[in-house]
Amino acid sequence: MLEAVGIIRETSSLPAVCGRVCPQEKQCESQCIYTLSLKKEAVSIGNLERYVADYERIHRDHSIKSKHSEKPKLGRIAVVGSGPAGLSFATDMAKWGYDVTVYEAESQLGGVLRYGIPEFCLPNSIIEDELDKMRDLGVTFQTDTIVGKTITYEGLKAQGMDGIFIATGVGVANYMGIPGEDLKGVYTASEYLAKY
């Protein structure tokens, strides 16, 4: 089973997340050869990914550090935003041998994973476990840091960053310009998901 974990992690940076919340039935399974050519039920890749990731989470030896952290670093990379794009990019860069720091404006990491997906769909413990795996790769995190205000892009370059990946994720909501949209108790979808 641990071999399956290694195979999945070659191409999926967040398998415990993707196995729970990605629409595999549209993205992967609808294009499965079993469905398209053989007219059979698709391989349930999302369920397999989740099962293998959960097995890893339960049976993982946290005392063993990744071999990747022993490699000499190729350079320093700043990642702005800790949502799925930022975390996936940071994981890949760390695997390839870069020293990666993720900067997050919020007090907790995860971006839309934490603030936009209800916890009954994606428990915070799953997010934390994926973050721990990233820490094992040598990725560091700075929360409560607004790049452009708390620290400037020039400041990042002055700290020796060789590259900056901007993964700021969910933007400002579009309002419809109708009466009452600014009243107390009226929320955008993002505000509602973050609040409740």
Segments (PLM) and residue ranges:
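Residue-level detector of alpha-helix initiation sites
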Residues: 13, 83-84, 108
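Ferredoxin-type iron-sulfur electron-transfer modules in oxidoreductases and energy-metabolism complexes
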Residues: 1-20, 38-71, 196
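N-terminal Rossmann-like FAD-binding beta1-loop-alpha1 element of flavoenzymes
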Residues: 76-101
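Glycine-rich FAD pyrophosphate-binding loop
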Residues: 98-114
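Glycine-rich dinucleotide-binding loop and its adjacent helix/turn
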Residues: 52-70, 129-149, 173-196
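Short hydrophobic core segments
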Residues: 80, 160-169
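N-terminal Rossmann-like dinucleotide/flavin-binding domain of flavoprotein oxidoreductases
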Residues: 5-15, 48, 113-161
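Short cysteine clusters
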Residues: 18, 22, 28, 32
